[in-house]
Amino acid sequence: MQALMLAAGMGKRLGRYTQNGTKCMVQVNGKALIEYAIEALVKANIKKFVLVVGYRSEILKEYISSKFNESNLNGMKIEYIENPVYDKTNNIYSLWLAKEQLLNDDTILLESDVIFDEKILFDIIKSPEKNLAMVSRFESWMDGTCTLLDEEKNIVGMLDKAHFKWSDINEYYKTVNIYKLSKEFSTQYYIPFLEAYQKAFGKNEYYETVLKVLTFLGSGNLKGFEVRGDQWYEIDDPADLAIAENRFAPTAEKLRLMENRYGGYWRFPQIVDFCYLVNPFFPPAKLEDELKSNFGVLLRAYPSGAKQQNLLAGKIFNILPEHIVVGNGAAELISSFCSMVTGKTAIPYPTFNEYPARFCNSETVEIPVNRDTFEYTVEDILKVVDAEKANNVLLINPDNPTGHFLKKEDLFKLLDELKERNVQLIFDESFIDFAEKRYTVYSY
């Protein structure tokens, strides 16, 4: 069995990462994609590796020669086929240039921008099925050609973006762009149809389109070989590269890279997020249905102005609209408000770091808390106010991140004491939903 990689493309969407090299030379965690691929092929005992090259081909050849030789290729031969018109053609023509190789042996077909767990390569090679397309059950982050499988894993349909329907995603399997093709399949079906398709539609097409035609005609007996979505990733742009580095980082590095993303974990469906303030029970099904029902209007219509939003918020919370300011999340409101605060501000620590970071015109002083329980009392607050002659007190209730909570009667006592001292209370109840409704300082 041999392997064939299509590596002639320019990889324009990767920008600076492909200015001086090819897509398969892009580094993922300090190693080029081509290195990952060759190492996996060597371990799989592949005896010949053919690359169809074009853009920056000499640079790629030199790079491979600098990394691999007889001592670490385990007898695997590397051959190159040049696509001299790589900038005017698409991968259907690159594959056509390798037709003689496809006719001579069973082939593992790879694309140069896919990083994968070597185990899935071993598994597809060991499979008794002769003709396989590696696929993953569709997930929201995926993009590109999808397949439909029957109960016996036969591919009965291939869909491009034009025919993709979000309503049918539970039936879709995304192509991984790794195939196992027998020389009989290539001889009887694939090569003849590649030739015919190019004559009819030209060379600026995709080889998967021919597989789509074969599937439509019920020819070729191509089956789906299912793998998990976290075992591979296709790298088309810098955002993809960042995700791939997360997925394939050494275990010790994964947490650091994940934390640097600060959210967006929906791109990693296998991750369960216990760090960010997300509610696994939200939204209720009824609310979600209502949002879906009105999504078209919400998407197309211009949003209400601040006056109308204040009026609606006041209705919900039973507060006069002139006492409400609506913002794009708490961080925006905190930044705007804190810039107007002057003098000294007393804060229990640890606290939500967005506040002290935004007090650009105010000096912050610490209200000490019990280091074992993180508790503090009204008396603890007043002691610091008097000692430091504080002008403001910041209180988050329940506190973030400690969860400490002052009851309503304690809050009113604190308000009376601060009023006598002419000290302003900055009061944040962002997390009041974690307490019972009767504990909030307002009624609604």
Whereabouts are the PLM-identified features?
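Conserved alpha/beta core of the MobA/IspD/sugar-nucleotide pyrophosphorylase nucleotidyltransferase superfamily
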Residues: M1-A3, Y172-N260, W266-Q270
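Conserved N-terminal catalytic core of the sugar/cofactor nucleotidyltransferase
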Residues: M1-M5, K31-D105
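N-terminal nucleotide-binding beta1-loop-alpha1 segment
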Residues: M1-Q19
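Conserved core of the sugar-phosphate nucleotidyltransferase
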Residues: D117-F201
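Active-site pre-lysine segment of PLP-dependent enzymes
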Residues: D123-S127, E375-K389, P401-Y444
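N-terminal "arm"/small-domain region of PLP-dependent enzymes with the aminotransferase-like
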Residues: N246-A301, E388-K389
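Conserved N-terminal alpha-helix of the aminotransferase class I/II PLP-enzyme fold
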Residues: D289-N328, E332
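PLP-dependent aminotransferase-like
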Residues: S339-L395
